Amino acid sequence: KCKYQKVIVDTYWNPGSDNGRPELFTPAFRLDLFFLGYKKGLRNHDGVSLEENFGELPDNLQDYVEWVRKWIIQKKSEGCVALKIAMAYERSLHFEKVTREQAERVFRLKESDITQEDIRCFQDYLFWKICEIAAEVSLPLQCHTGMGQVIDTNILQLNNVIKNNPETKFVLLHCGFPWVDDLFSIVDGYPNLYPDLTWLPILSYTASKRVMHQLIEMSQIDKICWGCDTWTVEESYGSLLAFRFSLCSVLREKIEDGYLSVNNAKDIIDKILFDNAGKIYV
């Protein structure tokens, strides 16, 4: 019923896996675990270990960054079509441009001496490096925005990173909900920014309609994508129905107002539900 040709899957417990179904799933390579690489033995909030998935950790910053680069290149060769970062569940999305010296300090300290500032500097540095690597290997970078630990997880926290990495494609998942106005403030200024309506119609029908209305009026149709962001087949179909209802409601209103023709609306449906994703994830 969903009529999907391919599904981009995020197997966060086994990053970069196609879940054993390559005919259906194309992986995004989730990189959150690598933000724990400043010390051995750490696990994320889901109990997943970086070392158990990717082996022994390098013990210095330069080798660590190259190690991350190696894994990204390998996962791309295995079929990954995107990188993904969902660190908004763990921390702020305000990633500062820190120096190498600031970032590598954490490798020289005993675990008992490591501060939150040391961890932040390491993670900030790594995020900027990942943005550079994403451009080098031509993989879009999906960023979970909005919901999570909700302190500084709005889209504007990423403004400086997006501005200074013009060759990196930033796919902003969930459009920063509930702070969707942040998206409107910068989407027109960055050709490398792609709004993604994933999850949004389930979170808020009203917000999803508002976002689509405004993005259509801002001529962003060629950049919008949608995804279900669900676990099961039943949930995925329900998510698709919710999005169809929201999108059709928006297009009907735009046609009734004389803003769009029926052919314009059909073109928008094709782009959001198929064409745009095909151009981004190539």
Show where each model-derived region lies.
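A generic structural motif
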Residues: 197-203, 226-228, 261-267
